[in-house]
């Protein structure tokens, strides 16, 4: 009996020893992972990335700028390798999933959430949160599960905005589930972050573009409105609740934004908004906006003052919608508000609102009958000049959320661009969209300069390849109108990456490598750009180049929906594909374009007849002057050219 007991005791001790050893190894692995240090380093590297980009904005001599940029690019390579290694270690630890403790998942959630607020790196956030989500689902830790689903939904929504629209419906599932839980339990939240997330969820769920996409009923929309009202009253009327004032203020602002968005939503489609409940709801918000106008008329603080003016603008829109104002009355009122607000000393915080006011005023200007076309054009040109000023200022405001959406909305709004000729509309796209991002604009201009020489040789030596384009059917006509061919190709080169501007948060991401999903998503810049370039017949001429410049000579490549082989502009598309490839500065990571110029030349020669037009490749390699000049532009002169581009891009308004 004693022997049995002794043996059993030894067995227990051996098990305990093994357990202690295992616990020790787990603790050691956790300490080695050191999430605090890793995320602190990731944050510093991200900020260093931005800081080094910001240094490019400064006025400095050319040689100094080139030296700084060379150091920057080398530093970014080091940072990227360092961050990739740290992220691999984090993923490997949580991917194992064995005996990871609750507090370790809590730490991951906290660190990722903080990092997302700073960087808006949606892909990395979604990937890392996906390792914590199953744990909270299994353990029924509902508040942490709520936070996970909230962050996941917000990150997926951002991914959807960059072009992967199918992700929005995944995001919607997470956000609705989190919002439903948050509304039921917000009085019991233990963490301040949870209050921050619930307000952000309402803010996102009630954005007008998502209201329209989901085609919600008025009842569903109004139910969410009532929920937000309850939350706002409780957060701002509970003296025992000690919360960051910014969270309370955001909730109150979101409450206003919700009212604003609902009114915009109701006014967007007259045909569906004739029912009695809708009219009653419109009347309610009409009265509320009148009250808000009175309440906020004496506010002078910039952000609140902008809110009051936004409410007042919508008030005049509602007056017209309900038949109480003529288009002229609403236009004059909105224009007056806009003119007073644009004189604000610091317009950066209200730039998005100002662009929105121009869009609203342009609508009433277009439909009013009291003004002559000359008077309308005078207002429109004034607005255009203001927009150019705002976009210049925006170049020094890094990644202002929503700015690109607002610029794209006004550029593609027929009530705004109807006043302008083809050249003016081209100016709109160049200054308001293409110039909204420095790196993409720099790449487009480099492609343009390389392409100009390519087109010059093509016209001179092989004009027959261009016969039949632009209405000129003979070689003689092509030679006689070479300026038109140059201009056409110049516009095609400038606009070819138009769709990348929406994706600039991803294309400008240098502190880590892109995932395969991100590389795949970047291909969406082709249909996105094609949709924007199709705003009118003038720009639609460049549709084939915008959507087809990654299509191969043999018909392969992407997108599948575009048939390059049968395109009437095939020779232009083929020439642009070669020019874009040789520049190589902003090509898609998934395409594996080598950084070394000689390596690119090797690929160009090897893939003639499959990826590249063999006749154009032969023309390029057999023309010594073109070959030499292109090498200069792509190598030793490239940094000098980039300096000139950045100088024009940023410094034109630094002295103002």
PLM features per residue range, with description:
Residues 1-26:
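Classical Sec-dependent N-terminal signal peptides that target proteins to the secretory pathway
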Residues 23-110:
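N-terminal leader/linker segments that initiate helical-solenoid repeat arrays
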Residues 40, 103-114, 144, 150-158, ...:
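"A position-specific structural signal for the A-helix of alpha-solenoid helical repeats
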Residues 85-102, 132-145, 179-191, 225-250, ...:
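Flexible helix-coil transition and linker loops at the boundaries of alpha-helical arrays
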Residues 392-520:
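Acidic/His-rich, divalent-metal-binding segments that scaffold phosphate/diphosphate chemistry
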Residues 446-456, 521-534, 596-612:
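An active-site-proximal "capping" alpha-helix that borders the catalytic cofactor pocket
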């Amino acid at each position: 009996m004693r022997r049995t007991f002794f043996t059993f005791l030894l067995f227990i001790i051996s098990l305990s020893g093994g357990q202690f050893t295992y616990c020790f190894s787990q603790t050691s692995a956790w300490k080695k992972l050191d999430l605090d240090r890793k995320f602190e380093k990731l944050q510093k590297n991200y900020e260093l990335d931005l800081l080094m980009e910001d240094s490019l904005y400064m006025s400095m001599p050319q040689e100094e700028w080139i030296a700084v940029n060379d150091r920057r690019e080398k530093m970014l390579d080091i940072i990227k390798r360092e961050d990739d290694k740290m992220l691999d270690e984090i993923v490997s630890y949580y991917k194992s999933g064995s005996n990871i403790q609750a507090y370790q998942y809590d730490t991951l959630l906290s660190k990722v959430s903080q990092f997302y607020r700073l960087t808006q790196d949606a892909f990395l956030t979604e990937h890392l949160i996906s390792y914590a989500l199953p744990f909270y689902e299994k353990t029924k830790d509902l508040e942490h599960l709520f936070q996970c689903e909230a962050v996941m939904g917000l990150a997926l929504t951002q991914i959807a905005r960059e072009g992967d629209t199918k992700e929005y419906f995944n995001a919607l599932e997470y956000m609705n589930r989190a919002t439903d839980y948050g509304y039921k339990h917000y009085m019991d939240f233990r963490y301040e972050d949870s209050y921050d997330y619930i307000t952000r969820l309402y803010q996102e769920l009630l954005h007008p573009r998502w209201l329209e996409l989901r085609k919600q009923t008025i009842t569903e929309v109004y139910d969410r409105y009532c929920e937000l009202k309850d939350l706002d009253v409780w957060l701002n009327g509970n003296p025992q609740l000690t919360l960051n004032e910014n969270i309370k203020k955001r909730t109150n602002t979101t409450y206003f934004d919700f009212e604003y968005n609902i009114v915009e939503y109701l006014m967007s489609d007259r045909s569906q908004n004739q029912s009695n409940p809708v009219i009653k709801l419109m009347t309610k918000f009409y009265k509320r906006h009148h009250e808000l106008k009175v309440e906020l008329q004496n506010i002078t603080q910039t952000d609140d003052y902008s809110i009051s003016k936004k409410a007042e603008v919508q008030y005049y829109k509602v007056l017209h919608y309900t038949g109480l104002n003529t288009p002229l009355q609403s236009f004059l009122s909105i224009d007056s508000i806009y003119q007073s607000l644009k004189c604000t000393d610091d317009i950066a915080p209200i730039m998005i609102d100002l662009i929105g006011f121009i869009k609203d005023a342009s609508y009433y200007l277009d439909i009013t009958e009291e003004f002559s076309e000359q008077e309308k054009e005078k207002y429109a040109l004034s607005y255009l000049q203001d927009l150019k000023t705002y976009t210049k200022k925006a170049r020094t405001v890094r990644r202002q959320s929503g700015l690109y959406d607002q610029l794209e909305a006004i550029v593609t709004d027929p009530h705004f661009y109807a006043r302008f000729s083809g050249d003016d509309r081209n100016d709109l796209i160049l200054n308001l969209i293409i110039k909204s991002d420095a790196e993409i604009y720099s790449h487009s201009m480099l492609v343009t300069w390389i392409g100009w020489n390519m087109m010059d040789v093509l016209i001179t030596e092989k004009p027959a390849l261009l016969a039949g384009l632009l209405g000129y059917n003979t070689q003689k006509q092509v030679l006689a109108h070479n300026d038109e061919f140059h201009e056409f190709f110049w516009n095609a080169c400038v606009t070819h990456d138009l769709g990348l501007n929406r994706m600039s948060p991803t294309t400008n991401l240098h502190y880590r490598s892109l995932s395969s999903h991100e590389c795949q998503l970047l291909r969406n810049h082709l249909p996105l750009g094609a949709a924007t370039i199709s705003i009118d017949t003038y720009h639609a001429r460049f549709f084939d180049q915008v959507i087809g410049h990654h299509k191969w000579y043999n018909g392969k490549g992407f997108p599948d929906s575009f048939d390059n082989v049968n395109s009437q502009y095939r020779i232009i598309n083929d020439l642009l594909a070669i020019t874009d490839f040789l520049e190589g500065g902003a090509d898609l990571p998934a395409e594996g374009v080598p950084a070394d110029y000689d390596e690119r030349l090797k690929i160009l020669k090897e893939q003639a007849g499959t990826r590249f037009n063999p006749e154009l490749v032969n023309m390029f390699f057999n023309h010594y002057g073109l070959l030499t000049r292109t090498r200069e532009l792509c190598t030793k002169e490239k940094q000098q050219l980039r300096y000139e581009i950045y100088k024009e891009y940023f410094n034109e308004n630094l002295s103002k």
